[in-house]
């Protein structure tokens, strides 16, 4: 039997198929790159559409930056230019309800951040010693001491006094320790001392509050 060889036509068909496959792969890669480049824009458009809400549907105002709705209809409220999203308004305005329709209104500034002062807890010292109710205002992490051990005591700023939290031990050379608190005044103008730590001969100790002026002292 004669051998059947591969003719020129068969080779051309294989080359054409290979070229077609290569073109398909290049087209698929190009389409993938185009889709990746277009995806962020599509997501941004979707976000804006969701913010604006459905066409003709109700849209709730942003309560955090919108002024409260007026109780009475302001003049010209229904004739104001309407909006559907904050992006349609100038920089310092928000799309809010003006009593008749959604329009660009002045944004309300966010509420201020309050830095609450620390309220110390009363602490029992053991035996007959205790601390009275803590002061109303305390400087955050402001330590102080009234013990004079040859050096200047760690005093508080003007208008504050040292509220003793730990009496220390003079015999052991341990100074007392406290926190700076704002001074309170009585009706007659005298400063109310938050606490004076007293020790009695029989060994008992207690803390008392009494009016007076000047720095706190350690009584023997």
Swiss-Prot record:
GO CC annotation, single: extracellular space
Entries under Gene3D superfamilies matching the protein: Elafin-like (4.10.75.10)
Keyword field contains Signal: yes
UniProt keywords, alphabetically: Disulfide bond, Protease inhibitor, Secreted, Serine protease inhibitor, Signal
PROSITE patterns reported for this sequence: WAP
Any one GO MF annotation of this record: serine-type endopeptidase inhibitor activity
Disulfide pattern: 66-96, 78-100, 83-95, 89-104
Signal sequence annotation: 1-31
Annotated ranges, domain WAP: 59-108
Stretches that traverse the bilayer: none
Keyword Signal on entry: yes
Compartments (UniProt record): Secreted
Pfam families from the UniProt entry: WAP
Location of region: Disordered: 46-70, 199-220
Biological-process GO terms, alphabetical: negative regulation of cell growth; negative regulation of inflammatory response; negative regulation of wound healing; regulation of cell growth
Primary role: Has growth inhibitory activity.
Protein name: WAP four-disulfide core domain protein 1
Organism for this UniProt entry: Homo sapiens
Gene: WFDC1
């Amino acid at each position: 039997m004669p051998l059947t060889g591969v003719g020129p036509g068969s080779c051309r068909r294989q080359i054409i198929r290979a070229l077609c496959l290569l073109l398909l792969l290049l087209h698929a890669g190009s389409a993938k790159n185009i889709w990746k480049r277009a995806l962020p824009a599509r997501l941004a458009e979707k976000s804006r559409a969701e913010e604006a809400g459905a066409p003709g549907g109700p849209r709730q105002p942003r309560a955090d930056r919108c002024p409260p709705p007026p109780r009475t209809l302001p003049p010209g409220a229904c004739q104001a230019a309407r909006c559907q999203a904050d992006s349609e308004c100038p920089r310092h305005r928000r799309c809010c309800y003006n009593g008749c329709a959604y329009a660009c209104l002045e944004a309300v500034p966010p509420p201020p951040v309050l830095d609450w002062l620390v309220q110390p807890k009363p602490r029992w010292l053991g035996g007959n010693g205790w601390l009275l109710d803590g002061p109303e205002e305390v400087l955050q992490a402001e330590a102080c001491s009234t013990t004079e051990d040859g050096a200047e005591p760690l005093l508080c700023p003007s208008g504050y006094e040292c509220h003793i939290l730990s009496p220390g031990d003079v015999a052991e050379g341990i100074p007392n320790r406290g926190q700076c608190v704002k001074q309170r005044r009585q009706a007659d103008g005298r400063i109310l001392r938050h606490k004076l730590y007293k020790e009695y001969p029989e060994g008992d100790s207690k803390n008392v509050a009494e009016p007076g002026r000047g720095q706190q002292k350690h009584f023997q």
